[in-house]
Amino acid sequence: MLWTYDMMSFQKIYSPTQLANAMKLVRQQNGWTQSELAKKIGIKQATISNFENNPDNTSLTTFFKILQSLELSMTLCDAKNASPEAAEQQDLEW
């Protein structure tokens, strides 16, 4: 499970599709097209489209390039004790 930060709230992420949708929303909120984001990180627009529409086949390398270009980070939490507060505390400990 992964928490994403969206509009002052945390969202639990349970699937690659949810993750891709959350990252697509961030891209759109920043006013970037798929082409603009792809150019920013040196990949093809089709690669961004494939990630947003079929994230199961995206390599981890591509995923992290997109994540970094969107100025996002990822925090892993113990699913049994997951909460926004736990995620923030874990982030503070690093």
Curated annotation (Swiss-Prot):
Residues 23-77 form the HTH cro/C1-type domain. InterPro entries: Cro/C1-type_HTH, Lambda_DNA-bd_dom_sf. Disulfide bonds: none annotated. Residues 34-53 bind DNA. Pfam families: HTH_3 (PF01381). The keyword Transcription regulation applies. Antitoxin component of a type II type II toxin-antitoxin (TA) system. Neutralizes the toxic effect of cognate toxin HipA. Represses the hipBA operon promoter. Homodimer. Forms a HipA(2)HipB(2) heterotetramer which can interact with DNA. This complex also blocks the toxic activity of HipA. This is Antitoxin HipB. It comes from Escherichia coli O6:H1 (strain CFT073 / ATCC 700928 / UPEC).
